[in-house]
Amino acid sequence: MKNEKKFNTALNLFILVGMLVAVVVTNVFKVQQPGARHFMLLLASVGAFTGVINTVLSANGNIWTFLFGVIDVSVATVVAFDSSIRTGGEPVWGNFALHAFYFLPMQFVGWWQWRKHGADSHKKVNARRLDSRQWLMMLSGMLIGITAGYIVLCKVAGFDISGTFRYLILFDAIVFVLNVLGQILMSFAFMEQWYVWILVNVFSIFLWSEKAMSSAESSYTVVMVIKYSFYLLNSLNGLRIWYALSRDS
């Protein structure tokens, strides 16, 4: 037990430091871009830092994840709103609406649900597992969501859906739907959320790797690959911890 606690502490510290370094380096690249708005970058950095803490606490079943989640999502909402005002782009407004009316309320739902399942400032949440009916509902919803998301993104991008299969747009749709699904499973304390977050990070690594091979800003994209690699490691750690938490429950 003592050795396991030391291992968990060391692994969490490694993941936390790795994520934070990746965030810092990412923002260094952004500051150097022409027309960079330093205040908004600083605000986004605060959100990114709290987001890192949020994910590590979530992996450990700590209810304070939602406090940092509220800060992270609130900052992301402000940044998305600012981008929408400046660009007027429909996808950006969609990002604002997603954060303001979905991810932000789900932080409070998560706090309430985790409290119902035994979590407090000293105790980890009593994690749950999906039953067969819930698995079927989740997979059906995921398939419908990805299909609808792919069609919408193709329309927004001006592509013919019946034309060449556009796998990068499909991956964008998959990541979007998995993020929505993962938040639901997280807020309701289901262990299976970590399967979803693992997929999110794997697809994100693939997408950024693809950009790294085709973009002139290869240094920035490589940093993003490293960043999501740490997120993937955190997801694997979360699966390990939550598997035990749900078994104990």
Tell what function each PLM region has.
Residues 1-17, 132-137:
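N-terminal membrane topogenic signal
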Residues 24-38, 56-61:
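Short, hydrophobic transmembrane alpha-helix segments
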Residues 29-47, 95-104, 162-175:
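Structural signature of hydrophobic alpha-helical transmembrane segments
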Residues 29-33, 78-95, 155-164, 212-222:
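Helix-coil boundary and interhelical linker segments in multi-pass alpha-helical membrane proteins
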Residues 54-68, 184-196:
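Membrane-helix interface "capping/anchor" motifs
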Residues 71-117, 122-126:
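Hydrophobic, ordered structural segments
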Residues 147-160, 173-192:
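Alpha-helical transmembrane segments in multipass membrane proteins, preferentially the mid-helix core
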Residues 181-249:
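C-terminal transmembrane-bundle signature of multipass membrane proteins
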